[in-house]
Amino acid sequence: MIRKIPSFIEVYKSLIQIPTISSNNKLLDQSNKNFIDLLSNYFSDLNFSVKNYQIPHTDKYNMLACVGSGNGGLLLSGHSDTVDFDEKKWTKDPFKLTETNNKFYGLGAVDMKGFFALILEVISSINIKKIIKPIYILATANEETDMSGAKNFIQSTIIKPDCIIIGEPTSLKLINAHKGHMSYSIKVIGDTGHSSNPDHGVNSIEIMHDVIRSLLILKKYFKEEYQHPNFSIPYPTMNLSSIHGGSAINRICPLCILNFEIRPIPGLTLTQIEIVIKEKLETIMKKWSHRIFIKKLFSSVPAYECPHNSGTIKIVEKLCQLNSAAVNYCTEAPFLQRIAPTLILGPGSIEQAHQPDEYLEHYFIQPTKNIITKLINKFCY
């Protein structure tokens, strides 16, 4: 029996008011269980079969809701978590949906709890008894940190939809490619001493100077050797993000730490990048093997592309009257792409994500509902 669920606004409010912060800082990190339980109840009320999966060794959960059976169909996906927030910079309650000036404000309003509210609104208005292929709804955990929700899902699922749509905020532009992300920290350990006698110590900043020179050669190599014309910045980028070292003007610096990131383009794998980093740093690492240490800062995200010759892209482009494009930020797409052709298409601007007073503009509501309806009609009826 299908039960009536609350209105779009009431559902949206209820999703925003449940904190689901993901953070690498354990003091800020929160479970998403209450959110997943609520979302599960909404889909259960709409006659979906719902399963919640705990991410091993965490208090985080994925939800997979399904109606219909058989092969193919459509998977609509989003992440349940949000980033943390600076209360001093917010002028509104992050956990209370505030509607004003044709905008919906709240933490996760655009990234990306609003997408779930819109899915529920559409599902509640269609006749799901007539579908011939399944509709899947996936809500993942930890997208904002290590993407362990998506990684865990693809390792355990057996479903094979015809198409996956991730509803990240793209201003309803169709995205078929994005860069990846890798981050590293290099630590150089020297020997301190008084600066009046430099030969009685080892200056870690001087060694780091040679490390940086090698990294800049690598940066140039990426720009010259790898190109992807669909990106506004068509080559892999490297950013030397921060450097710290030294404690006093009259001391030889004993420790210097450099953090940097690389954003690879499709066609350049994480393994390839790791190999070329080792190659470019090989000489200096051999010279100072006991003084230079490199480690990953965060879990790496591969670059992603759903090829333009994919039948799925052609179907969705025609259906939604959109042309696909590439972006520089990361999503769960490279992981979900392993089980089915995956595209990114969702309401709101990425410029509002992770910002104080995050909001979803009202004018995205009806067009998003129209697109979700078209996608369901195409892939499931």
Swiss-Prot record:
One of its GO terms (cellular component) is cytoplasm. Pfam families: M20_dimer (PF07687), Peptidase_M20 (PF01546). Its main location: cytoplasm. Pathway: Amino-acid biosynthesis; L-arginine biosynthesis; L-ornithine from N(2)-acetyl-L-ornithine (linear): step 1/1. Binds 2 Zn(2+) or Co(2+) ions per subunit. This is Acetylornithine deacetylase. Zn(2+) 1 binds at H79, D111, E168. The gene is argE. It comes from Buchnera aphidicola subsp. Acyrthosiphon pisum (strain 5A).
